[in-house]
Amino acid sequence: MRNALIYPILTEKATRMTEVQTQYTFKVNPRANKLEIRKAVEEKFNVDVDSVRTVICRGKRKRQFTRKGLIEGKKSNWKKAIVTLKDGATIDFYGATASAGQANG
């Protein structure tokens, strides 16, 4: 599948997982499976992937009060992938490069 990865998720929790366990979190195409996600990460960042876990996050219901009354809607469901890299591999999202050695810092 083309375009399995949509963008990396860079929240506080995801950053903590990256620093401690070399796990990276991505928003992915809802139709992508684990093998496609693994191949996309390996090709894009040139790293070895140890495992891939996926979660389907439910879309939230939204309400807005307007002059015409209550407008209700729902955000779409989306899929998140947590990718664990093999020992020693890292991804630099800001430079879009990967290194197999030690992390800079």
UniProtKB/Swiss-Prot annotation:
InterPro entries per the UniProt record, alphabetical: Nucleotide-bd_a/b_plait_sf (IPR012677), Ribosomal_uL23-like (IPR013025), Ribosomal_uL23/eL15/eS24_sf (IPR012678)
NCBIfam families named among the record's database cross-references: PRK05738.1-3, PRK05738.2-4
Family: Belongs to the universal ribosomal protein uL23 family.
One Gene Ontology term from the biological process aspect of the record: translation
Gene Ontology MF annotations: rRNA binding; structural constituent of ribosome
Signal peptide: none
HAMAP family: Ribosomal_uL23_B (MF_01369_B)
Listed name of the protein: Large ribosomal subunit protein uL23
Keyword Nucleotide-binding: no
Cross-referenced PANTHER family: 60S RIBOSOMAL PROTEIN L23A
UniProt organism field: Chloroherpeton thalassium (strain ATCC 35110 / GB-78)
UniProt KW keywords: Ribonucleoprotein, Ribosomal protein, RNA-binding, rRNA-binding
Keyword Nucleotidyltransferase: no
Assembly: Part of the 50S ribosomal subunit. Contacts protein L29, and trigger factor when it is bound to the ribosome.
GO CC field: ribonucleoprotein complex; ribosome
Function: One of the early assembly proteins it binds 23S rRNA. One of the proteins that surrounds the polypeptide exit tunnel on the outside of the ribosome. Forms the main docking site for trigger factor binding to the ribosome.
A Pfam family matched in the record: Ribosomal_L23
